Amino acid sequence: MTRIGTPLSPTATRVLLCGCGELGKEVVIELQRLGVEVIAVDRYANAPAMQVAHRSHVINMLDGVALRAVIEAEKPHYIVPEIEAIATATLVELENEGFNVVPTARATQLTMNREGIRRLAAEELDLPTSPYHFADTFEDYSKAVADLGYPCVVKPVMSSSGKGQSLLRSADDLQKAWDYAQEGGRAGKGRVIIEGFIDFEYEITLLTVRHVGGTTFLEPVGHRQEKGDYQESWQPQAMSPKALAESQRVAQAVTDALGGRGLFGVELFVKGDQVWFSEVSPRPHDTGLVTLISQELSQFALHARAILGLPIPVVRQFGPSASAVILPEGQSQQTSFANLGAALSEPDTAIRLFGKPEINGTRRMGVCLARDESVEAARAKATRASQAVKVEF
């Protein structure tokens, strides 16, 4: 039975969030609604989730000693990773010592790098994936590309938001793609995955919730990527009953293997009735921001319920919905957003501004949300809203 105490008192139920981006911010808001005391931790001050948490700490998230010190001082009931770049070996140690890591420390460790999760999916679970090789050197990488053929995709084994990811179309791209992958890895230069290109029709995120009552699948989320980073998403993505059933089978297998409770974002490629596993995040997914307008309980609310052991009897979908990112390019520590009235002038629209403290280059600073009679109309409406927002540096 779940019991939640009073925040900032001896009975408080404490959650420590590792990583404080826009997704973490929404998770904190949902936990706050349930009377949970939230401690936010990230590598920079005034990160979005810190702005709505009870208190915060700034540390190097890859420093296991610093991470352990904060966790031992705060004594949280739940440790909730919101990003991949964390000292996961320390989380494994802490879990073995009795701390509760969401969904599990093993899940955060396996999904922190593409090799762990790919080997689990393809080699242990025998799920369909693209053909792949791993390489540590330019020589091995060149051999892998020759073996897989063109086109193929290269990514650092440890990166996020498309950093270091390239599509190789010919030998002319070989050196450039290698250099870009070496620059884009979270741990600096290192290992890469080379994947044979799948001729898919579309890709989806199947948001999957493991909770006290079992596993619940949300309506599939379609999305459009540029340079590995999401630009817009929509729900539901139309797909054949066979493809949907296969997507749910793959998602169930992966999330069961990872274990624990919480929401997972399972990324899949689809062509006709065929489905291939791509990646999984053991936490809310950026493409799932659309659920802020498409569902009665967003992915963030569902994650909070699952973490706390609360039931999820039903997930109500409000109809065709879409999200479009606000993705400016510039430099500022005091960004402003104007023309919001125009952006919100149509019915069934909403905006989330993330409150990121600075921009230096291209950065996702917000998202526009819309509902309509069809997915196409919702996408067009969300895009109109996003384009109406004027970003001032």
From Swiss-Prot:
Instruction: Show the InterPro entries listed in the entry.
Output: ATP-grasp, ATP-grasp_carboxylate-amine, ATP_grasp_subdomain_1, PreATP-grasp_dom_sf, PurT, PurT/PurK_preATP-grasp, PurT_C, Rudment_hybrid_motif
Q: How does it assemble?
A: Homodimer.
Q: Which reaction does it catalyse?
A: N(1)-(5-phospho-beta-D-ribosyl)glycinamide + formate + ATP = N(2)-formyl-N(1)-(5-phospho-beta-D-ribosyl)glycinamide + ADP + phosphate + H(+)
The residues that cross the membrane are none
Q: Which NCBIfam families match?
A: PRK09288.1, purT
* Top EC class, one word: ligase
What pathway does this protein act in? Purine metabolism; IMP biosynthesis via de novo pathway; N(2)-formyl-N(1)-(5-phospho-D-ribosyl)glycinamide from N(1)-(5-phospho-D-ribosyl)glycinamide (formate route): step 1/1
User: Pfam families, from UniProt?
Assistant: ATP-grasp, PurT_C, RS_preATP-grasp-like
In the record, the note on similarity to other proteins reads:
Belongs to the PurK/PurT family.
Q: Which domain of life is it from?
A: Bacteria
Protein's GO biological process: 'de novo' IMP biosynthetic process
UniProt EC number: 6.3.1.21
Q: Which GO terms describe its molecular function?
A: ATP binding; magnesium ion binding; phosphoribosylglycinamide formyltransferase 2 activity; phosphoribosylglycinamide formyltransferase activity
Gene Ontology cellular component annotations, sorted alphabetically = cytosol
Write down what this protein is called. Formate-dependent phosphoribosylglycinamide formyltransferase
Its function, per the record, reads:
Involved in the de novo purine biosynthesis. Catalyzes the transfer of formate to 5-phospho-ribosyl-glycinamide (GAR), producing 5-phospho-ribosyl-N-formylglycinamide (FGAR). Formate is provided by PurU via hydrolysis of 10-formyl-tetrahydrofolate.
- Specify which residues bind ATP according to the UniProt entry for this protein: R114, K155, S160, S161, G162, K163, G164, Q165, E195, G196, F197, I198, E203
Which amino acid positions bind Mg(2+), per UniProt? E267, E279
Residues forming the ATP-grasp domain are: 119-308
UniProtKB keywords = ATP-binding, Ligase, Magnesium, Metal-binding, Nucleotide-binding, Purine biosynthesis
The UniProt record gives the binding positions of N(1)-(5-phospho-beta-D-ribosyl)glycinamide as E22, L23, E82, D286, K356, R363, R364
